[in-house]
Amino acid sequence: MKPARIVFPGFWFGKSSIKKAEELARLGVGGFCLYGATAKKAQDFVKRMQDVSPYGQLLFCADITDTLQEVITDAPALPANGKIGQHDFPQDVAYRKGYLTARMALAVGINWVLAPVVDLGYNTPAFGDVPLQVTQLAGDFIAGLSNGGALNCVKYFPGVSGVLKTLAQMEDAEFVPYKHMFRRADAIMPSDMIFPNIDNDNQAMLSDKVIKGLLKKRLNYKGCVVSFPLFKGHLKYEAASAVKMLHCNVENILAPRDAEGVIDAVEREVDKGFLVDEIIHAVSNHEMFLSKVAAGPEPLPVKEAFALAEKDFKKK
C-alpha cells in the first residue's frame, strides 16, 4: 500500500521545481494539479511525470471554476457558465462546453476536470440561481465531460450560497443539484468555508458533520470525496489538516503547499494502524478512474482539439 498515491501535488509552471515534481512522482503520488501552463508545457510535463512514476499512468487535474483557460493559458475561450442560460438552447451549449473542455483537456494530458461548480448565484462560475436550472445545465456539462473522456468533480459542497442558511432551507435549494448528480459525479469537493448552522467549528472540508454526517449519511452519497485545494484553504497546520480530512472520508488530497510533509504525516498515521482501509478504498477508486479514462475516446492532437472548440462557439 502506498499512501502517497492519494496525494496530488500542485505544479505551477514557471514557479515550481521540475526536479521536485519528479521526486514526488517517483514517491508514487497519484497525479498532479496543473496551474498556469501552455498546452505544450502541459504535454511535456505529463509525459515526464508518467515516465518516472512507478505506476506509468497518473491522473492530471485541471482545478477550474469555469473554463480551461484558467489553467491552460492558450486554450480557446468557451462561454462563461453564468451566460449559458442566455442562449437559445442552453442545455446544448452546456453539453458542448463540457464536451469541448474534455477534448481540449485530454489533448494536453489532463484527464480530470475539477468542475462543475454547482453553487447557486448570479455571477460566473454559477450556472444560475434557480436550483433546477443549475441542475440541468451542470448535468449537461457533466454529460459532455464524460462523453469527451474526462473525469468530473462537482463542487463546492454543501453550497456556498447556503452559508447562512439552515439545513431545511438548503434542502430545497443548494442540495438539489447534488442529489440529482450523485450518480454521475466522479467526485465531490467540499467548500473551504464554515457553515455555522451545520458545524460552527470547522471548515466544510475539515468537518466530520458536513462530510460524514451530511454528505455521506443524510444525502447518501457513496462516491469519492476530494479535498479543496489545500494551498487555497487558509490552513495553519497543513499536514495535520490533511490527516483530519482523511478521517472525515476525504479520499484524495489536492495541491498541498508541502506535498512531502503531507505524505509523511499520512504514512505516520498508517504506521499507527489508522486509515489503512480508507487508503485501500481510495486507491481502488483511483484504479477505477484510470480504467474509466482508458476506456474513453482517444485524445485529439492539440491543434485539432483547440480548432474544434474555436469553430464550435464562433456562432454561439
Protein language model features and the residues they cover:
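Preference for extracellular/luminal or secreted protein segments
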Residues: 1-28, 217, 236-316
